[in-house]
A protein has these predicted regions:
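Conserved subregion of the PPM/PP2C metallophosphatase catalytic domain
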Residues: 2-5, 9-174
């Protein structure tokens, strides 16, 4: 996606469009294909594209789907085991304007599981082993604490050259 104000504007536009599609009841895969086509058409004039990482979670069943267009890995932690979800689709806007599908991975989550979504500014372009190790070893209870630790540590792992964003979810039973 890049970094700086232009990349921020492009990703902001993508988020707004995707939110509108989803709030209107469009299913995630159709919404993402439409977003990809819209960005591809827009890109013919402005060269715009963006990575997309979308997590859909049914809080009643625990069924989750991770949708990706060119996004950094997503990590799921169950106990101390961390799995890595990746994809091969190009960023939205570059993935072909004909409604090319995003990568989709399905996973079942339950109380006590954690999900980590990061940008490539956190995961870096080198090995992301440090992210997986840090995520597996985290002993705290606060997603906010883990998020801040990952952002802070990413600068030492090649992430300082790009925008850095991390989102941590911990599922709890209520």
């Amino acid at each position: 996606m890049g970094s700086g104000p232009e990349a921020g504007q492009e990703s902001g536009l993508a988020v707004r469009l995707l939110e509108q599609f989803l709030r209107a009841g469009v299913r995630p895969e159709a919404a993402l294909k439409t977003l990809n086509s819209a960005l591809a058409l827009r890109g013919e004039e402005t060269g715009g594209f963006t990575t997309v990482d979308l997590l859909r979670l049914d809080l009643f069943t625990g069924e989750a789907a991770v949708y990706k267009y060119g996004a950094a890995p997503t990590y799921v932690r169950k106990g101390k085991t961390v799995s890595r979800i990746t994809g091969s689709a190009l960023p939205a806007g570059l993935a072909g304007g004909d409604g090319a599908a995003p990568d989709v991975a399905k996973v079942r989550l339950e109380a006590g599981d954690w999900v980590l979504l990061v940008t490539d500014g956190v995961a870096g372009s080198d090995s992301d082993l440090w992210v997986r190790q840090r995520f597996a070893a985290f002993e705290g209870e606060s997603p906010k604490d883990l998020t801040q630790a990952l952002i802070d540590e990413s600068a030492g792992h090649g992430g300082a050259t790009d925008d850095r964003t991390a989102l941590v979810l911990r599922l709890e039973k209520r």
